From Swiss-Prot:
PTM comment: The N-terminus is blocked.
Active-site annotation: D469, E472, D568 (proton donor)
Glycosylation sites: N54, N404, N495, N517, N728, N823
EC number(s) recorded for this UniProt protein: 3.2.1.20
Composition bias type Pro residues, residue spans: 112-123
Reactions accelerated catalytically: Hydrolysis of terminal, non-reducing (1->4)-linked alpha-D-glucose residues with release of alpha-D-glucose
Class of this enzyme: hydrolase
Entry superkingdom: Eukaryota
UniProt name for this protein: Alpha-glucosidase
Organism name: Beta vulgaris
Function: High activity for alpha-glucan.
């Protein structure tokens, strides 16, 4: 809230009373002018009536009346229906709609959600409107529920306003009380211009999200415009609207309660600018409705649990998707991709999935194979060989269907009438195959068509997943606007491409029509989302195979269907660093399976850059090397230094595969990211809020990469506690409070540390995930003097679509470790043990880190069906050695079945009985 405007309030104890009652001096009409029009953008609304539903106490409805019309950006809508409702105890929904006319909003069948409470009756059925509230008697209407910490206050001022705050702290989370002299703070509601603004405490609010944009920092910088309009703009361009739209932000407060976090989501698919100045956030939307959700949190994990409960939990990914992937645009033929696979094997670098870009197609047409360079028989042999080796194959698809009249896919599409139309005919665009029509994925017939085409292709070539690209949708031409149309040329110009470029530029025109008489203007940002839905539907048939899908264009909720990569980055050191904020942002957007093109896509990479990039990229949730044609090849085996680093870091990644897969299970269960900012684990450490060069995998493994050329030192932030290096377990960082430390990082090394209090189940290194899954488990236990150590391991067949669901083909193991004065206990609990027992998975070794004394086995018991059985220690070896002030103890030759609960008691050397 702007302190300079405080005279408009007449409450003497503003700081205390504001969340409960706002006393506003109502001034005359605003004199703030729009720079271009010479008149105010709008004058706001006043409350005509407001009522809390006393039967539930969970909703409030009101009718709002326009104060005065303004012609800027078109005429205002005169009457608005307003509702505020508790969707859940921790989720408050705020909705403004036209009281008399239905407006576009995302269909419930596209993004399922609970219905809002009934709106006030339309004006035609209102017999008597209440008289205007006298301006000298401002009142409030409060919505509060005993089960929620959130409360809503509606201010009957002129113009009206509202706040959402925490009852426990009186911290205002969303403050839409207007400044009477400033129309940019008013609610404005026109057909093609909607405005909603909230003041923010600039020094206490730390905002993240509102993508997709490439930025150097994870935390949003002040004084910027964030535009949401899906566009085929290379991601090496900073601060421009890119492939996806995610109108969600998370706000972590540094006071009054440090680390208190909430989320804000505007459910709207139309183009928009979000202006963020630090002390204010303002939405400027060119259509739809205002449908705002506030998630109470109050931790970051709780916010994402609440957010993904609404938009959809992240899809489970097959186990093999966590392996290493290789791709390039420009592979000449099937012989070249076979050679690439062979050379990875010769170099002993793990390779899980081979990809092909558009090169494999016949003249770039979907669902075809180049008969000369990628003939069907050779491709079938190639995929068969991959599968025999435990490897996979994923090709690319673009949505544009070439209009060649002899092309079977086009013929069937025309017969089914499935393409987007303009002026009554299929809209003709142009992409890689030349002239194309675009399937209308809002049309059930188009979804069926797409599913059938994928089935036809999979029937001849057993692909393992699909990569969908160019689905913003991209168009190589810009069609002329329809004369006089305010859709192709809206009155408010969003900051498209950073220069208010027309929204028709290089995409489907806004006047094109979808199924159900929906305009492209309204549905544009949903195109990639809808294609992801249809493509995943195709991939779940047959249902016995876990689907994998990667999409460039995304929207809120896309994580329910697809993974994502950061798009066309460049082989630049800046892009290496930018990949971290983008990865962390997509974790917030409910898309935890995220990564960047390792070594860079555009431009030619260098040996040093590629070496440092694979060191970082090995820890992306989605880890893929991808490059553009006409650039230097960058397969990891081409430089010995890169190959050596790849063997090391991918070896560690494959050891950590059970950990990554367990994190994916948690993401599907609660919406938690796989790659996380340091602030997620350390929300009370304000210094972590601005860190964009390090990240966590899960809650306890910290990655601190080299991001500058020629550097052999990393100035890394170390939150409080003990951190042990995962490269050798022998070096550690111990700090009582968070501080920056200098870490050695020679060219072949990346710093990866595990924090005290964590237990991680690992398996052995291997060339494929299939081979890694057959190796014994190794339990890594990091002890803490302050908390018990814990960890989890989720196990299933690696391709389940209903992960952890009914049917019993899964096991969850929880691990615990705690030390006393003379002893230490490590134990496990097993949920649904039958599946793990049937697989006969074995844990062979336990490594204990962070000990201050040597230990030896005192007692070892396992849980049998008949009860706990004491096991003699014969055959089990315990070794300890001191490194860096801590002992490392290894208990080997355990042969412990993972599906069997156990308890291991260890005695400290020199302990008295």
């Amino acid at each position: 809230m702007e302190r300079s405007k405080l005279p408009r309030y007449i409450c003497p104890t503003l700081a205390v009373v504001l969340p409960l009652v706002l006393c506003m001096v109502v001034e005359g009409a605003t004199t703030s002018k729009n720079d271009n029009q010479g008149e105010a953008i709008g004058y706001g609304y006043q409350v005509k009536n407001a009522k809390v539903d006393n039967s539930t106490g969970k909703s409030l409805t009101a009718l709002l009346q326009l104060i005065r019309n303004s012609p800027v950006y078109g005429p205002d809508i005169h009457f608005l229906s307003f509702t505020a409702s508790f969707e859940e105890d921790d989720t408050l929904r705020i909705r403004f709609t036209d009281a008399n006319n239905r407006r576009w909003e995302i269909p419930n069948e596209v993004l399922p959600r609970p219905p809002p409470p009934p709106s006030p009756p339309p004006l035609s059925s209102l017999q008597h409107l209440p008289k205007p509230i006298p301006q000298n008697q401002p009142t409030t209407t409060v919505l509060s529920h005993p089960h929620s910490d959130l409360a809503f206050t509606l201010f009957h001022t002129t113009p009206f306003g509202f706040t959402i705050y925490r009852k426990s702290t009186h911290d205002v989370l969303f403050d839409a009380t207007p400044i009477p002299s400033n129309p940019t703070t008013f609610l404005i509601y026109k057909d093609q211009y909607l405005q909603l603004s909230s003041s923010l405490p600039a020094q206490q609010a730390h905002l993240y999200g509102l993508g997709e944009h490439t930025k150097p920092t994870f935390q949003l910088a002040h004084n910027q415009i964030l535009t949401l309009w899906n566009a085929d703009i290379a991601s090496f361009n900073r601060d421009l609207n890119l492939y996806g739209s995610h109108p969600f932000y998370m706000d972590v407060r540094s006071s009054p309660m440090v680390g208190s976090t909430h989320g804000v989501f505007l459910l709207n698919s139309n183009g928009m600018d979000v202006e963020y100045t630090g002390d204010r956030i303002t939405y400027k939307v060119i259509g739809g409705i205002i449908d705002l959700y506030i998630f109470a949190g109050r931790t970051p994990e709780m916010v994402l649990d609440q957010y993904t409960k609404l938009i959809g939990r992240p899809a489970p990914m097959p186990y093999w998707a966590f392996g290493f992937h290789q791709c390039r645009w420009g592979y000449r033929d099937v012989n070249e991709i076979e050679t690439v696979v062979d050379k990875y094997a010769e170099a002993r670098i793990p390779l899980e999935v081979m990809w092909t870009d558009i090169d494999y197609m016949d003249a770039f047409k979907d669902f075809t194979l180049d008969p000369v360079h990628f003939p069907l028989d050779k491709m079938q042999q190639f995929v068969t060989k991959l599968h025999r080796n435990g490897q996979r194959y994923v090709p690319i698809l673009d949505p544009g269907i070439n209009t060649n009249k002899s092309y079977g896919t086009f013929i069937r599409g025309m017969q089914s009438n499935v393409f987007i139309k303009r002026n009554g005919n299929p809209y003709l665009g142009s992409v890689w195959p030349g002239p194309v029509y675009y399937p209308d994925f809002l049309d059930p017939a188009a979804r069926s068509f797409w599913v059938d085409e994928i089935k036809r292709f999979r029937d001849i070539l057993p692909i393992d997943g699909i990569w969908i690209d160019m689905n913003e949708a991209s168009n190589f031409i810009t069609s002329a606007p329809t004369p006089g149309s305010t859709l192709d040329n809206p009155p408010y110009k969003i900051n498209n491409s950073g220069g208010r470029v027309p929204i028709n530029s290089k995409t489907i025109p806004a006047t094109a029509m979808h199924y159900g008489n929906v305009t492209e203007y309204n549905a544009h940002n949903l195109y990639g989302f809808l294609e992801s839905q249809a493509t995943r539907e195709a991939l779940v048939r047959p249902a016995t195979r876990g689907p994998f899908l990667l999409s460039r264009s995304t929207f809120a909720g896309s994580g329910k269907y697809t993974a994502h990569w950061t798009g066309d980055n460049a082989a630049r050191w800046d892009d290496l660093q930018y990949s971290i904020p983008t990865m962390l942002n997509f974790g917030l957007f409910g898309m935890p399976m995220i990564g960047a093109d390792i070594c860079g896509f555009a431009e030619s990479t260098t040996e040093e850059l590629c070496c440092r990039w694979i060191q970082l990229g090995a820890f992306y949730p989605f880890s893929r090397d991808h490059s553009a044609r006409d650039t230097t090849h960058q397969e990891l085996y081409l430089w010995e230094s890169v190959a050596a680093s790849a063997r090391t870091v991918l070896g560690l990644r494959y050891e950590l595969l059970p950990y990554y897969y367990t994190l994916m299970y948690d993401a599907n269960l609660r919406g938690s990211p796989i790659a996380r900012p340091l602030s997620f684990t350390f929300p009370d450490d304000v210094a972590t809020y601005g860190i964009s060069s390090q990240f966590l995998i899960g809650r306890g493994i910290m990655v601190s990469p080299v991001l500058q050329p020629g550097s052999s030192i990393v100035n890394a932030y170390s939150p409080r506690g003990n951190w042990v290096s995962l490269s050798n377990y022998t070096s550690s960082v111990s700090v009582s409070a968070g501080t920056y430390v200098s870490l050695s990082a020679p060219p072949d090394h990346i710093n990866v540390h595990i924090h005290e209090g964590n237990i991680v189940a690992m398996q052995g290194e291997a060339m494929t995930t299939q081979a890694a899954r057959s190796t014994p488990f190794h339990l890594l236990v990091v002890m803490s003097d302050h908390v018990a150590s814990t960890g989890e391991l989720f196990l299933d067949n690696g391709i389940e679509m209903d992960i952890g669901g009914p049917g019993g083909k899964w096991t969850l193991v929880r691990f615990f470790a705690e030390s006393g004065i003379n002893n230490l206990t490590i134990s496990s609990e097993v949920v649904n043990r039958g599946y793990a027992m049937s697989q006969r998975w074995v844990m062979d070794k336990i490594t204990i880190l962070g000990l201050k004394r040597r230990v030896k086995i005192k007692e070892y018991t396992v849980q049998k069906d008949a009860g706990a059985i004491k096991v003699k220690g014969l055959g089990r070896r315990t070794s300890s050695h001191n490194q860096g002030g801590f002992f490392v103890s290894v208990i080997s030759d355990l042969r412990q079945l993972v599906g069997q609960a156990f308890k291991l008691e260890l005695e400290f050397e020199g302990a008295t009985r």
